[in-house]
UniProtKB/Swiss-Prot annotation:
Protein's UniProt name: Cytochrome bo(3) ubiquinol oxidase subunit 1
Transmembrane segments annotated in the record for this chain: 15-35, 59-79, 107-127, 146-166, 190-210, 226-246, 278-298, 310-330, 348-368, 381-401, 414-434, 457-477, 491-511, 581-601, 606-626
Stretches in topological domain Cytoplasmic: 36-58, 128-145, 211-225, 299-309, 369-380, 435-456, 512-580, 627-659
Gene label: cyoB
UniProt source species: Buchnera aphidicola subsp. Schizaphis graminum (strain Sg)
CDD domains found in the cross-reference section: Ubiquinol_Oxidase_I
Cofactor(s) required, per the database record: Cu(2+); heme b; Fe(II)-heme o
Listed PANTHER family: CYTOCHROME BO(3) UBIQUINOL OXIDASE SUBUNIT 1 (PTHR10422:SF35), CYTOCHROME C OXIDASE SUBUNIT 1 (PTHR10422)
Catalytic activity: 2 a ubiquinol + O2 + n H(+)(in) = 2 a ubiquinone + 2 H2O + n H(+)(out)
């Protein structure tokens, strides 16, 4: 009845795992008890869990990302500590099979459940506001996409205490991921957590692509869109094209494991290298799915805090489009050692070098925007400058790795690990932190504490270079990635420095937690009463903070790129107008319902509980059919309510002397 699931699936003989899992359960019980005690379940259900408001969904994406960041960071600390101990002549505290699960989970968590939610959360907040829309094109899909990501994260977390996770690395190359070499449920957990969250991401891509193409304010042609919206458009094009490749690849691997197919096996016509090609045809665009939105963040931040028009708007747009196209013809640089031949390697090496050109164009545009500007060193600008330094180093090491002979030496070494983290942390994570500090008032109506924000930045930047610069040297010294036992003692000193860097990053995360706490505590002091605390240039700053549920009482008409900026110079951006009732989408619990049964389907597929798989899949299909015929999906915001909200905003702006 329960397939392969038995009590033996609980790893009671692994004290570290059991203590961790029991701690997670106790924390979950404490949170549930607190919500019950304060009678907040009804509030959470109606205001948050069932919401289709893109702004609230962006907040929930951020919460998911920070929860999973904590889990992923703990994994990183465990790995660093194990390597330090193992390089000092001891065996360490993590057995090899547990260490292998940790480094696999770390990669999956940080890419799929930290970086992606951060990026999608920012797009959820900013895109509709920047294009003058009241919501996304498909509000229900937005809610469903979020909860599918949550289901994927929960399924991955379940593997910690029920069964095991994959020991294959975050991309699960066959034949190691085939059932012959990984007969346990770890790879199945990996497949279904990625499959469920990947479907949610694909729906997000479709949703935002349609939103940007069809819901822009009147007069906003493509070359009047803000650069962040351009970056979001290209990002979602990449999502819509590349994520179906991931879904298909995982499906083929599932057929190999469950039904004895031979797509990626070493025999009966299978081809493991086909898997590697397919996974990286998704994987390298995924890098730019993460990076392009934060390029948009930096464009907005630099222009705002330099008090200047963005330098080279058109070249920035074309550079973004060039990166979007080139990202699909560089994937083979991840495996030059495959043996495809010198001509193939040369082609992909050259395209990899070429993609550095539009990236360089962007960096120079940001520098020229700052040049002779009245630069205000807000914490968002600090994250931006940190990015410029860190990402440039990551880019240079990437160009070095694009040379096939060099890659043959450095492939699978810690040099590669350092390069990858240079790009992802220095680019994506720093960019998301810049965006959070920048747009936080638009979500919550008050400004984040600057003192603790700057402390967080300095611990992060110093910790990052302390943690990852030694890895470049270790790579040159010949240390390969994913080692946990019998590490050469000559690596001990540099590994110890890297571990100190990880601790400094941990202090940076603690500073961010304190920043949020202090900001909430002092929110009445740091209120954003005007909706435009930074003297911004784009449409989102024309609304109150927090932005009203309908975003815009009257859809704006756009005349130029920096329309709001021009209106402010004319001193007439806010005035009393005639309003009409607005139709807005209703909240729905169907998204969380479908995602729960998707989670059940994934769990039952992992453990071969066939009856539960069929039942949960059937419930998902019936729910989607029910949603497709439901016509009661909207409610009306009255003119009286709109006037109340807008007049209050007008009064605040007039008091601030901005009329």
């Amino acid at each position: 009845m329960f397939g392969k699931l038995t009590l033996k699936a609980i790893p009671v003989d692994e004290p570290i795992i059991m203590v961790t899992y029991i701690s997670i359960i106790l924390i979950a019980l404490f949170i549930s008890f607190s919500i019950t005690y304060f009678k907040k379940w009804k509030y959470l259900w109606y205001e948050w869990f069932t919401t289709v408001d893109h702004k609230k969904i962006s907040i929930m994406y951020g919460i998911l990302a920070f929860i999973m960041l904590f889990r992923g960071f703990v994994d990183a600390i465990l790995m660093r500590t194990q390597q330090v101990i193992a390089s000092s002549g001891n065996t360490g505290f993590l057995p090899p099979h547990h260490y292998d699960q940790i480094f696999t989970a770390h990669g999956v968590i940080m890419i799929f459940f930290v970086a992606m939610p951060l990026v999608i959360g920012l797009m959820n907040l900013v895109v509709p506001l920047q294009i003058g829309a009241r919501d996304v094109a498909f509000p229900f899909l937005n809610n469903l996409s979020f909860w599918l990501n949550v289901s994927g994260a929960i399924l991955l977390t379940l593997s910690l205490g029920i069964g095991e996770f994959a020991q294959t690395g975050w991309l699960a190359y066959p034949p190691l991921s085939e059932v012959k070499y990984s007969p346990g449920v770890g790879v199945d957990y990996w497949i279904w957590s990625l499959q469920i969250s990947g479907v949610g991401t694909t729906l997000t891509g479709i949703n935002f692509l349609i939103t940007i193409l069809k819901m822009r304010a009147p007069g906003m042609c493509f070359f009047k869109m803000p650069v962040f919206t351009w970056a979001a458009l290209c990002t979602n094009i990449l999502i819509v094209i590349s994520f179906p490749v991931l879904t298909t690849t995982l499906l083929l691997l599932t057929l190999d494991r469950c039904f004895d197919f031979h797509f990626f096996t070493n025999n009966f016509g299978g081809n493991p290298m086909m898997y590697v090609n397919l996974i990286w045809i998704w994987g390298h665009p995924e890098v730019y799915i993460l990076v392009l939105p934060v390029f948009g963040v930096f464009s907005e931040v630099v222009a705002t805090f330099s008090k200047k028009r963005l330098f080279g708007y058109v070249s920035l747009v074309w550079a973004t489009l060039a990166i979007t196209i080139l990202s699909f013809i560089v994937w083979l640089h991840h495996f030059f050692t495959m043996g495809a031949g010198s001509n193939v390697n040369a082609f992909f090496g050259i395209t990899t070098m070429i993609i550095a050109i539009p990236t360089g164009v962007k960096i120079f545009n940001w520098l020229f925007t700052m040049y002779q500007g009245r630069v205000h060193m807000h914490s968002s600008m600090l994250w931006t400058i940190g990015f410029l330094i860190t990402f440039s180093i990551g880019g240079m090491t990437g160009v070095l790795l694009s040379i096939p002979p060099a890659d043959f030496i450095l492939h699978n070494s810690l040099f590669l690990v350092a390069h990858f983290h240079n790009v992802i942390i220095g680019g994506v994570v720093f960019g998301c932190f810049a965006g959070i500090n920048y747009w936080f008032p638009k979500l919550f109506g008050f400004i984040l504490n600057e003192l603790w924000g700057k402390r967080a930045f300095w611990f992060w930047i110093i910790g990052f270079f302390t943690a990852f610069m030694p890895l470049y040297f270790l790579g040159f010294m010949g240390m390969t990635r994913r080692l946990s036992q019998n590490i050469d003692i000559e690596f001990h000193f540099l590994l110890s420095i890297a571990a100190i860097g990880a601790i400094l990053i941990g202090i940076g995360i603690l500073c961010q937690i304190i920043q949020f706490w202090v900001s909430v505590r002092d929110r009445h002091i740091n209120l954003d009463v005007t909706g435009d605390p930074w003297d911004g240039r784009t449409l989102e700053w024309s609304t109150s903070s927090p932005a009203p549920l309908y975003n815009f009482a009257i859809i704006p008409h756009i005349k130029n790129k920096d329309d709001f900026w021009e209106l402010k110079k004319q001193k007439n951006q806010v005035q009393k107008k005639q309003y009409s009732a607005i139709h807005m989408p209703k909240n729905t619990g169907l998204g969380i319902f479908i995602s729960f049964f998707s989670l059940l389907f994934g769990f039952s597929a992992v453990w071969n509980i066939i009856w539960l798989s069929f039942l949960s899949f059937l419930v998902v299909i019936i729910s989607l059919i029910f949603k497709s015929i439901d016509e009661n999906t909207e409610y009306t915001v009255s003119v009286k309510e709109i006037e109340s909200i807008e007049n209050r905003h007008l009064e605040n702006v007039q008091k601030a002397g901005l009329k």
